[in-house]
């Protein structure tokens, strides 16, 4: 009676012991690698070059805002409200930082409704990996803190 239980536990955790860490650089992710990453237990890490691009892409809009330029979704609202200021030029200083964070949290909640049927775990994981890979390519303007949340998924 105990043997089948032990065997089933071993079979359940075996795939996790062979899991690999896949490196994302924003340039070389293939469909085959993406599918492999989607398996349970597979992990991702961003390469040093990818992290450098993430940091640079975050710095660009911050610097532009500091120079007084309106940055869509950072210092000004979205869509029809694009002419409304959300935060002042110094978006990393208070009270502008809190105003910008609050604004973007509100926008995420508005757009993040989940309706059934939910995506399969593998599909959800692939979407997260694609987004992290886009960040590593340096085209998103996302912060390092935001990018750090993705590998945990």
Language model regions located:
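Sec-dependent N-terminal signal peptides
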Residues: 4-13
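N-terminal signal peptide c-region/cleavage motif recognized by signal peptidases
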Residues: 14-19
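Conserved, well-structured ligand/cofactor-binding cores
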Residues: 20-153
